From Swiss-Prot:
Species classification: Eukaryota, Fungi, Dikarya, Ascomycota, Taphrinomycotina
Protein's name in the database: Homocitrate synthase, mitochondrial
One GO term (biological process): lysine biosynthetic process via aminoadipic acid
Matches recorded under InterPro entries: 2-IPM_HCS-like, AIPM/Hcit_synth_CS, Aldolase_TIM, DRE_TIM_HCS_fun_bact, Homocitrate_synth, LeuA/HCS_post-cat, PYR_CT
Pathway field: Amino-acid biosynthesis; L-lysine biosynthesis via AAA pathway; L-alpha-aminoadipate from 2-oxoglutarate: step 1/5
Effect the entry attributes to changing residue 163 to K: Severely diminishes affinity for 2-oxoglutarate and substantially impairs catalytic efficiency
Outcome recorded upon mutating residue 167 to A/Q: Abolishes the catalytic activity
Mutagenesis / variant outcome for changing residue 74 to A: Abolishes the catalytic activity
Source organism (scientific name): Schizosaccharomyces pombe (strain 972 / ATCC 24843)
Alphabetic keyword roster: Amino-acid biosynthesis, Lysine biosynthesis, Magnesium, Manganese, Metal-binding, Mitochondrion, Transferase, Transit peptide
Highest taxon above the source species: Eukaryota
Record-annotated active site: 321
Length: 418
């Protein structure tokens, strides 16, 4: 900042690269402005406790996601049930622009069914941590590598994409993981996957593992982060910084337990990093409609503090905040609400309300107030707000009554002097 000698105000100088939160041009491995979203509402999201999507609803969600601009849609394994298989086939026949994937166990029986559904790719997974090797499938690393090799070669022979992922990656032995990924990369998988299945990883652990893996494999790297400890968004961002190429999301973050990286949250974070990339790639003004669609389907309310679309996401209440926002929204907003089809709201009915907000609201109602009058009226509104919550209609009524009193007083004064 520099200080103007004329009036003592500070002039804000833009950062040299235009965005202090943008990608580091010297970091050639970072993919924060060049990544793909694998949208898993119709796979991971089906594992949400309240979820039940019939065929019609799945098709509706798939079309909406495709129109929104996601790169991939991941579907529940066709082996899960007969209806799951039929739904997978139905969505594959829609002719969507995005690629359709299905998620299967590292079994040849699953692979044979999956490749016949018409999907563009198969996501193969098997547990690699000591917990899952002992209590889930009971197999050793030799068996895992052999099974992975067989399944991957089979899927590749059908001419479709294949991703191989470990499950519970961050509680797996690092040497085992790297040996496994090196083996499947040599076979020719399109992607390897890292999964924080229990949500235990920290951003630093994510960054370190992805950077290490990036030096071992030449294929793309997909990441799947659960949100048990509230780190799914930060972990997804750090994965991209470290060189990951694909991130799994679900609408509203729904999934097993308390879910995975929310689609809207990831886009909020990446928008700050590269607004142009995100606004050109995705139809952001459709995000609220997408979230409402899924929220209704699983019978939940969108949280008040939800990223971007929550009722309070662009609401400003404190007087000093409101004054600055009215002068320049960038003072207290890192996201532009209009880019997401949202609106800014300045709260004017509380004990925290400042006179700038009251004057701005009066102007919206075509009521002219001087600064002194706005300050006087603000004192009156604060007194009322100390007693009870004031709705916008309450504030508007007080504004109109005050302005009417001013008009009457002005008329009487003019008549007396005539």
């Amino acid at each position: 900042m520099s200080v103007s000698e004329a009036n003592g105000t500070e002039t804000i100088k833009p950062p040299m690269n235009g965005n202090p939160y943008g990608p580091n041009p010297s970091d050639f491995l970072s993919r924060v402005n060049n990544f793909s979203i694998i949208e898993s509402t119709l796979r991971e999201g089906e594992q949400f406790a309240n979820a039940f999507f019939d065929t019609e609803k799945k098709i509706q969600i798939a079309k909406a996601l495709d129109n929104f601009g996601v790169d991939y849609i991941e579907l529940t394994s066709p082996v899960a049930s007969e209806q799951s298989r039929q739904d997978c086939e139905a969505i594959c026949k829609l002719g969507l622009k995005c690629k359709i994937l299905t998620h299967i166990r590292c079994h040849m029986d699953d692979a044979r069914v999956a490749v016949e559904t018409g999907v563009d790719g198969v996501d193969v997974v098997i547990g690699t941590s000591q917990y899952l090797r002992k209590y889930s499938h009971g197999k050793d690393m030799t068996y895992i590598i052999d099974s992975a090799t067989e399944v991957i070669n089979f899927v590749k022979s059908k001419g479709i994409e294949v991703r191989f992922s470990s499950e519970d990656s961050f509680r797996s032995d690092l040497v085992d993981l790297l040996s496994l990924y090196k083996a499947v990369d040599k076979i020719g998988v399109n992607r390897v996957g890292i999964a924080d299945t229990v949500g235990c990883a920290t951003p630093r652990q994510v960054y370190d593992l992805i950077r290490t893996l990036r030096g071992v494999v030449s294929c793309d790297i997909e990441c799947h982060f659960h949100n048990d400890t509230g780190m799914a968004i930060a972990n997804a961002y750090c994965a991209l910084e470290a060189g990951a190429t694909h991130i799994d999301t679900s609408i509203l973050g729904i999934g097993e337990r308390n879910g995975i990286t929310p689609l809207g949250a990831l886009l909020a974070r990446m928008y700050v990093t590269d607004r142009e990339y995100i606004t050109h790639k995705y139809k952001l003004n459709q995000l609220r409609e997408l979230e409402n669609l899924v929220a209704d389907a699983v019978e939940v309310q969108i949280p008040f503090n939800n990223y971007i679309t929550g009722m309070c996401a662009f609401t400003h209440k404190a007087g000093i905040h409101a004054k600055a926002i009215l002068a320049n929204p960038s003072t207290y907003e890192i996201l532009k609400p209009e880019d997401f089809g949202m609106s800014r709201y300045v709260h004017v009915g509380s004990r925290l309300t400042g006179w700038n907000a009251i004057k701005s609201r009066a102007e919206q109602l075509n009521l002219h107030l001087t600064d002194a009058q706005a300050k006087e009226l603000t004192v009156r509104i604060k007194k009322l707000a100390d007693v009870r919550t004031l709705a916008m209609d309450d504030v508007d009524r007080v504004l109109r009554e005050y302005h009417a009193d001013l008009s009457d007083a002005d008329r009487i004064t003019k008549e007396a002097s005539a």
